[in-house]
Structures are given as structure tokens and as C-alpha cells.
Amino acid sequence: MGRKWANIVAKKTAKDGATSKVYAKFGVEIYAAAKQGEPDPESNSALKFVIERAKQAQVPKHVIDKAIDKAKGGGDETFVQGRYEGFGPNGSMVIAETLTSNVNRTIANIRTIFNKKGGNIGAAGAVSYMFDNTGVIVFKGTDPDHIFEILLDAEVDVRDVTEEEGNIVIYTEATDLHKGIAALKAAGITEFSTTELEMIAQSDVELSPEDLEIFEGLVDALEDDDDVQKVYHNVANL
């Protein structure tokens, strides 16, 4: 499945450091999900899923509650999802997924980042066809064969189940992520460190130290933008 998910998580955690910026981005995502349906996670499955992911990222309860209360109070901001794709040095590719209340601002900011950080923004679909939209589930465990049987019995479309450093890592078809989570919960597995939809590169590249420095600057700048929710790439040594 390309780069190991455990390695991605470790690097992301070290970079994010559970900062206020991460909290703010989850706050926006929670608010948007609450506005699109009922502001009650028990009747809004999309909101429930975002809240579960926020808790996995150790977002404080008061941040979650504030975003829901804002939606309940009739906040009038409307957020739109977007995806921007482009290239870095020597075959490196990057995808930025956004959630914004001002699309024109976001487009301008993303273009500026690519131009200033040594990248080239591409047209829609220029990069994403080289990535697979994948459900990823991670939890503590050491018996991938047993987990695979659970998922197989529940008719979950599974791409792979591995064990990495004491964690079970499951890759599903994107459409079966929630079905996989439900099957695991029915089997008594209720504590997850990751339940995400991710774009995973079909193949990776290794960059030289010089090119890696340029590409890391591009990725960091994209991740630092307030409207960017997720950044995916195909560089194995980042």
C-alpha cells in the first residue's frame, strides 16, 4: 500500500504537535458537518465521524463543543470542499484538500504557495489519478489474519491488513470504510487510533536532499494554510 501508514502518522504527529492550528481545522470541519445536517452526532453520521476523528487527534472537548454550538446558533458561514493538485521537483506530486468559506481566497493562496515554493499547480485530475482513495483503520493488535477473517465475514472490501509495530493497519475500499468500522465494533473492537479516508500514492519517489528541502517547504506551506485540511504526496523520504 505504498508508504506505511504508521510512518505517516508518526511524522504527522511530530509535525502537528497537537497545535491550535490543528484544533482550528477540526473546528471548521465539525461546524461544516453540523451545518449540512442536524447538529447532533447521533442523527448526523458525517458529524459523528468527524468528531471521532477529532478525538483521535486529541482535539479538546471544548473545541468540539464550540463548533457544534456555533452551528446550533445559526452561524451563516457556508464552507465548500475543494481539491488542488500539483507537482514538485523530480516526479514528486502533491494534493491539497480544502474546506473554505471563500473559494477565491483559497485559489489565490494555493497558487501563490505553489509559485513561491518551487512547485507547479496542475489542472483537476493531473495528479489524483496516481493516488487511490482508501479507507484506513488503525488500532492496537497483533493478529492481522484474525482481523481479516472478521472483515471477510462482514463482506467488507479489504485491500490489505497488516501488523506494524503493535498496530493493526487495515486498508479498505473508500466506500467500505464505515462498513469496516462497524464490523470491528460488532466484534468488540471499539478503540481506534485512526479512521480516515486517505489518498495513497500508487508509487513513491525518493528525492535528493536538495529537492527534498524544496518539496518539504511546499508541503509545509500548504499544511499551514488555514483553508487546507489535508495534504497528500508521493515522496517516500519525507
Curated annotation (Swiss-Prot):
A single GO cellular-component term on record: cytosol
Species this protein is from: Salmonella typhi
Family to which the UniProt record says this protein belongs: Belongs to the TACO1 family. YeeN subfamily.
UniProt keyword annotation of Transcription present: yes
Gene behind the chain: yeeN
Record keywords, A-Z: Cytoplasm, DNA-binding, Transcription, Transcription regulation
Name the record gives this protein: Probable transcriptional regulatory protein YeeN
InterPro entries to which the protein is assigned, alphabetical: Integrase-like_N, TACO1_YebC-like_2nd/3rd_dom, TACO1_YebC_N, Transcrip_reg_TACO1-like, Transcrip_reg_TACO1-like_dom3, Transcrip_reg_TACO1_YeeN, YebC-like
GO biological process: regulation of DNA-templated transcription
Higher taxonomy: Bacteria, Pseudomonadati, Pseudomonadota, Gammaproteobacteria, Enterobacterales
GO molecular function: DNA binding
Subcellular location: Cytoplasm
Main location: cytoplasm
